[in-house]
């Protein structure tokens, strides 16, 4: 019941959005003219593929536990579990051990990857460094001829020196135990100059170290260092933080947050909000960036609902723990201009501007339709000039298990695993948006969902009017003899399944018609 009500409310929002005035210039700008071009310019493909970033080794462990497990029985000489020993350094307090900044404000960090990694691992490494690129002035770039670079190897274990040490600087990422999004970012953070969070000079104000529960040989791992804390608060959520049971001799906690002992520590998903802030502070990055790493939340422009500032150039990286990112605007007021050349929002299907564009430029006073990414990452860019401003925008983000957003025609899409059986507890959303003056013609060519009274188990709904009216729910084997045509230029399809029986699902094709 709750799912159905939520879907109806979402449909109402979407239908209101597409009926409001807005200038949106999608990457498929020729969509009105040529249907062949439309297919090539699809903004977002509804794909279901293995996302390298979502595959976690030893998933029940936090990052540091995985590192220690990977380092068992190897000859990598480390301190604190994964910091490769080199005498007499406190890099974060010494500018000599920071990577130099170029004239354009970028901090290039060359790296060389050994031949030990397979294609999936290389893709995962690239995904891990893309967050640094999106949110900081640090750029991990392939090594060419630079004297100082990171020499990344798979010789067993996970480990890094602190900061720039010169020459071919060793960084260990074992192919079998360390190729995890959070571990990669953790070791790269060491190479940028960061220690473990619980070794900060002010850590006693935030955690209690229970030395009585620590294996005696590992007490040194919990020493405090004379660190430069950059004026940034202690970060329990840091990718650099130990978990509460690290090096426990008796199964009792070794690190207890205070004053609230239940605060989560030792997360393994990746860089935290404050991790990003620390990098930008340490390297004096002149960037406007925001990380949104939660399952759901809100994204607003600066000063909203007051006018946003002139000469803004900001990005928001949405990184949900799983699924595909969804973004729904609730308010939108960006200075209007021909072609949205002055102030605009641009949305990318991935963590950097190198990824496919979902919305090329948007301005005006309407609402952008629901956006759905193909993975758990979406980048939003906002640019303003030095002249007129508006009140900005307000949007909510979340995630779905499957679905897509389509802007070109014709297109065929299916339920997950079709023609195989769909999975249990599926919750999918597809949105189709035609150009102004066009409608969506949907033809369901094959359909079989679990049958039940009032379709209460598995069902498909179609939302196709300006009032958000729903067609459905549909279930069982059905032969759809004719096409379903929307009453406006948009349509939304949702599919839900419960925990019991599964069937092959559906296949559907749509076109745009006048």
Swiss-Prot record:
PANTHER family listed in its UniProt record: DISCOIDIN, CUB, EGF, LAMININ , AND ZINC METALLOPROTEASE DOMAIN CONTAINING, EMBRYONIC PROTEIN UVS.2
Biological process, per Gene Ontology: proteolysis
Cofactor(s), by name: Zn(2+)
Disulfide bonds: 137-285, 158-178, 288-314, 340-363, 402-428, 455-475
InterPro entries: CUB_dom, Hatching_enzyme_Uvs2-like, MetalloPept_cat_dom_sf, Peptidase_M12A, Peptidase_Metallo, Sperma_CUB_dom_sf, ZnMP_hatching_enz
Its EC number(s): 3.4.24.-
Carbohydrate-modified residues: 112, 199, 421, 427, 464
Superkingdom of origin: Eukaryota
Keywords: Disulfide bond, Glycoprotein, Hydrolase, Metal-binding, Metalloprotease, Protease, Repeat, Signal, Zinc
Residue numbers binding Zn(2+): 186, 190, 196
GO function terms (MF aspect): metalloendopeptidase activity; zinc ion binding
Domain spans labelled Peptidase M12A: 90-286
EC class: hydrolase
Protein name (Swiss-Prot/TrEMBL): Embryonic protein UVS.2
Catalytic site: 187
Residues in the signal sequence: 1-19
Listed SUPFAM superfamilies: Metalloproteases ('zincins'), catalytic domain, Spermadhesin, CUB domain
């Amino acid at each position: 019941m709750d799912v159905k009500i939520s879907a109806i409310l979402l449909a109402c929002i979407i239908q209101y959005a597409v009926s409001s005035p807005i200038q949106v210039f999608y990457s498929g700008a020729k969509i009105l003219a040529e249907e062949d071009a439309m297919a090539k310019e699809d903004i977002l493909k509804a794909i279901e593929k293995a996302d390298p970033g979502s595959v976690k080794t030893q998933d029940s462990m936090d990052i540091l536990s995985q590192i220690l497990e990977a380092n068992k029985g190897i000859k990598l000489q480390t301190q604190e579990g994964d910091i490769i020993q080199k005498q007499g350094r406190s890099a974060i307090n010494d500018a000599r051990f920071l990577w130099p900044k170029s004239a354009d404000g970028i901090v290039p960090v060359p790296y060389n990857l050994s031949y030990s990694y397979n294609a999936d691992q290389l893709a995962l490494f690239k995904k891990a460094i893309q967050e640094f690129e999106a949110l900081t002035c640090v750029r991990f770039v392939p090594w060419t001829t630079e004297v100082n670079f990171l020499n990344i190897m798979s010789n067993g274990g996970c480990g890094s020196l602190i900061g720039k040490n010169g020459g071919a600087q060793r960084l260990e990422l074992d192919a079998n135990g360390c190729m995890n999004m959070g571990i990669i970012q953790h070791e790269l953070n060491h190479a940028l100059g960061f220690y473990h969070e619980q070794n900060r000079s002010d850590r006693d104000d935030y955690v209690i170290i229970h030395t009585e529960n620590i294996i005696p040989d590992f007490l040194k791992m919990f020493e405090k260092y004379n660190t430069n804390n950059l004026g940034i608060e202690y970060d329990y959520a840091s990718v650099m933080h130990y978990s509460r049971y690290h090096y426990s001799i008796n199964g009792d906690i070794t690190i207890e947050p205070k004053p609230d002992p239940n605060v989560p520590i030792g997360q393994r998903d990746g860089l935290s909000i404050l991790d990003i802030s620390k990098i930008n502070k340490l390297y004096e990055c002149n960037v406007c960036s925001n990380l949104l790493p939660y399952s759901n939340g809100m994204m607003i422009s600066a000063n909203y609902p007051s006018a946003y500032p002139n000469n803004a150039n900001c990005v928001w990286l949405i990184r949900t723990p799983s699924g595909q990112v969804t973004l729904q605007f609730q308010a939108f007021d960006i200075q209007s201009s021909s072609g949205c050349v002055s102030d605009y929002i641009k949305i990318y299907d991935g963590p950097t501007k190198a990824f496919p564009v979902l919305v090329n430029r948007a301005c005006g006073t309407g609402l952008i339709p629901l956006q759905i990414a193909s993975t758990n990452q979406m980048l939003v860019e906002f640019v303003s000039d030095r002249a007129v401003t508006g009140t900005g925008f307000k949007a909510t983000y979340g995630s779905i298990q499957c679905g897509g957003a389509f802007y070109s025609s014709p297109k065929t899409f299916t339920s997950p695993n079709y023609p195989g059986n769909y999975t249990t507890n599926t919750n999918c959303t597809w949105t189709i948006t035609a150009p102004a003056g066009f409608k969506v013609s949907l033809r369901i060519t094959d359909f079989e969902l679990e049958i039940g009274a009032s379709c209460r188990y598995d069902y498909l709904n179609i939302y196709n009017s300006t009032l958000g009216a729903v067609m459905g729910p549909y279930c069982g084997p059905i032969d759809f003899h004719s096409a379903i045509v929307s009453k406006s230029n948009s349509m939304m399809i949702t599919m839900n399944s419960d925990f019991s029986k599964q069937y092959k699902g559906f296949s559907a094709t749509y076109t745009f018609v006048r």
